[in-house]
Protein backbone atom coordinates (compact mmCIF):
# COMPACT_ATOMS: atom_id res chain seq x y z
CA UNK A 1 0.00 0.00 0.00
CA UNK A 2 1.32 3.41 -0.93
CA UNK A 3 1.68 6.04 1.82
CA UNK A 4 -1.14 8.12 0.35
CA UNK A 5 -3.56 5.24 0.48
Swiss-Prot record:
Keywords per UniProt:
Amidation, Amphibian defense peptide, Secreted
Q: In which tissues is it expressed?
A: Expressed by the skin glands.
**GO biological process terms on file:** defense response
- Could you state one GO cellular component term attached to this entry? extracellular region
**Localization terms from the record:** Secreted
Record has Chloroplast as a keyword: no
* Annotated protein name in UniProt: Tryptophyllin-T2-1
Q: In which domain of life is the source organism classified?
A: Eukaryota
Q: Which family does it belong to?
A: Belongs to the frog skin active peptide (FSAP) family. Tryptophillin subfamily.
Q: What is its main location?
A: secreted
**Organism ancestry:** Eukaryota, Metazoa, Chordata, Craniata, Vertebrata
Q: Which residues carry this modification: Phenylalanine amide?
A: 5
